[in-house]
């Protein structure tokens, strides 16, 4: 374990560094028309996890990029988390990753190049786990450490899973526990107990490979990964894009151990309140604990899956084969009123 504390060199952490949804909407507004590409199957309009381009013969190329500042202190683990998070977007689209290139920003006068080497080695290890090469990349001298990947994948066009194609009656499942932002904030504040240090990294370093299997099921109508906008933010994107609303069973949500303890210690990421400020008016009324969990920015979070009854049993069987025990966290229903997410306690 390195003695370097990477989180002390950055103002943000992981996907909590994301620009808030409200501000991002402003940034992405443009008066300049985009190129009308008939081969672009999935682009920017649906706020999806990756772009997909039709390359013929029923196949699509999936393209994505993701990078952020350190969310843990250990350089090797940071590299693993950043790579796992970037590759996840390919799995969330139902695709298979085929190659990655690295994105590195490094304060060369502050942190030794050997530390950056550990970060890249962590990313390389995860690429190996995913069965792809880390084939190159680009680096710059930056005021804070930044690492991530640009990842390319392939997907059969009839197996693409988007975030705006959910249907009324679909059941919602989440493949990883929530609370990553809370525990990593505890670490940044120096409040994380030694016995809890691996709770969040273990989740963040788990590849969402199962998304490729879920994509084979015709009843999986929509899929996305839960990252910086929190469960509420990414579910809201699914609901708005699909023209539905969600009834969320709060007590059924999977949580990392000790989440409530660290909430009581004031370990709430700044991104939580930015998230709530961006979309809180579209949520059911809720108490602080509910808000702090639903809006908690996840880094390398789980897959949020909307599945119809015709494929639900098969989805659970695939999950069980992968060692996952999934329980439903909610249901999609017809949209009524201005609130997209109803939270049942």
Swiss-Prot record:
<feature type="binding site" description="in other chain">
    <location>
        <begin position="46"/>
        <end position="48"/>
    </location>
    <ligand>
        <name>ATP</name>
    </ligand>
</feature>
<feature type="binding site" description="in other chain">
    <location>
        <position position="89"/>
    </location>
    <ligand>
        <name>ATP</name>
    </ligand>
</feature>
<feature type="binding site">
    <location>
        <begin position="137"/>
        <end position="139"/>
    </location>
    <ligand>
        <name>ATP</name>
    </ligand>
</feature>
<feature type="binding site">
    <location>
        <position position="225"/>
    </location>
    <ligand>
        <name>Mg(2+)</name>
    </ligand>
</feature>
<keyword id="KW-0418">Kinase</keyword>
<keyword id="KW-0808">Transferase</keyword>
<keyword id="KW-0460">Magnesium</keyword>
<dbReference type="GO" id="GO:0016260">
    <property type="term" value="P:selenocysteine biosynthetic process"/>
</dbReference>
<keyword id="KW-0479">Metal-binding</keyword>
<feature type="site" description="Important for catalytic activity">
    <location>
        <position position="18"/>
    </location>
</feature>
<protein>
    <recommendedName>
        <fullName>Selenide, water dikinase</fullName>
        <ecNumber>2.7.9.3</ecNumber>
    </recommendedName>
</protein>
<dbReference type="InterPro" id="IPR036921">
    <property type="entry name" value="PurM-like_N_sf"/>
</dbReference>
<dbReference type="GO" id="GO:0004756">
    <property type="term" value="F:selenide, water dikinase activity"/>
</dbReference>
<feature type="binding site" description="in other chain">
    <location>
        <position position="66"/>
    </location>
    <ligand>
        <name>ATP</name>
    </ligand>
</feature>
<dbReference type="InterPro" id="IPR023061">
    <property type="entry name" value="SelD_I"/>
</dbReference>
<comment type="subunit">
    <text>Homodimer.</text>
</comment>
<keyword id="KW-0711">Selenium</keyword>
<feature type="active site">
    <location>
        <position position="15"/>
    </location>
</feature>
<dbReference type="GO" id="GO:0000287">
    <property type="term" value="F:magnesium ion binding"/>
</dbReference>
<dbReference type="InterPro" id="IPR004536">
    <property type="entry name" value="SPS/SelD"/>
</dbReference>
<comment type="function">
    <text>Synthesizes selenophosphate from selenide and ATP.</text>
</comment>
<dbReference type="InterPro" id="IPR036676">
    <property type="entry name" value="PurM-like_C_sf"/>
</dbReference>
<dbReference type="GO" id="GO:0005524">
    <property type="term" value="F:ATP binding"/>
</dbReference>
<dbReference type="InterPro" id="IPR016188">
    <property type="entry name" value="PurM-like_N"/>
</dbReference>
<feature type="binding site">
    <location>
        <position position="89"/>
    </location>
    <ligand>
        <name>Mg(2+)</name>
    </ligand>
</feature>
<keyword id="KW-0067">ATP-binding</keyword>
<comment type="similarity">
    <text>Belongs to the selenophosphate synthase 1 family. Class I subfamily.</text>
</comment>
<dbReference type="Pfam" id="PF00586">
    <property type="entry name" value="AIRS"/>
</dbReference>
<dbReference type="Pfam" id="PF02769">
    <property type="entry name" value="AIRS_C"/>
</dbReference>
<dbReference type="InterPro" id="IPR010918">
    <property type="entry name" value="PurM-like_C_dom"/>
</dbReference>
<keyword id="KW-0547">Nucleotide-binding</keyword>
<dbReference type="GO" id="GO:0005737">
    <property type="term" value="C:cytoplasm"/>
</dbReference>
<feature type="binding site">
    <location>
        <position position="49"/>
    </location>
    <ligand>
        <name>Mg(2+)</name>
    </ligand>
</feature>
<feature type="binding site" description="in other chain">
    <location>
        <position position="18"/>
    </location>
    <ligand>
        <name>ATP</name>
    </ligand>
</feature>
């Amino acid at each position: 374990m390195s003695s370097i504390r990477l989180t002390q060199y950055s103002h943000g952490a992981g996907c909590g560094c994301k620009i808030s949804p409200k501000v991002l909407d402003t940034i992405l507004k443009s008066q300049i028309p985009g190129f009308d590409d008939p081969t672009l199957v999935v682009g920017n309009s649906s706020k999806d996890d990756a772009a997909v381009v039709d390359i013929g013969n029923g196949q699509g190329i999936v393209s994505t990029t993701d990078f952020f500042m350190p969310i843990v202190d250990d350089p090797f683990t940071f590299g693993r988390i950043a790579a796992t998070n970037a590759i996840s977007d390919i799995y969330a689209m139902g695709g298979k990753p085929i190659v990655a290139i690295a994105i590195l920003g490094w304060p060369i006068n502050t942190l030794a190049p050997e530390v950056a080497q550990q970060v890249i080695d962590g990313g390389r290890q995860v690429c190996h786990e995913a069965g792809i090469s880390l084939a190159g990349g680009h680096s710059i001298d930056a005021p804070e450490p930044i690492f991530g990947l640009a990842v390319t994948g392939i997907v059969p066009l009839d197996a693409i899973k988007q975030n705006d194609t959910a249907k009324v009656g679909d059941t919602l499942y989440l493949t990883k526990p929530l609370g990553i932002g809370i525990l990593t904030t505890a670490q940044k504040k120096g409040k994380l107990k030694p016995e809890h240090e691996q709770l969040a990294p273990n989740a963040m370093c788990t590849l969402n490979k199962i998304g490729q299997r879920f994509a084979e099921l015709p009843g999986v109508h929509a899929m996305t990964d839960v990252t910086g906008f929190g469960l509420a933010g990414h579910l809201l994107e699914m609901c708005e894009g699909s023209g539905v609303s969600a009834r969320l069973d709060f007590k059924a949500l999977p949580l990392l151990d000790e989440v409530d303890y660290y909430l009581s210690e004031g370990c709430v990421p700044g991104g939580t309140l930015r998230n709530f400020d961006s979309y809180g008016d579209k949520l059911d009324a809720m108490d602080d604990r509910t808000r702090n969990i639903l809006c908690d920015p996840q880094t390398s979070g789980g897959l949020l899956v909307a599945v119809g009854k015709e494929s639900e049993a098969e989805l659970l069987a695939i999950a069980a084969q992968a060692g996952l025990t999934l329980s439903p966290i909610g249901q999609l229903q017809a949209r009524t009123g201005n609130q997209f997410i109803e939270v049942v306690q």
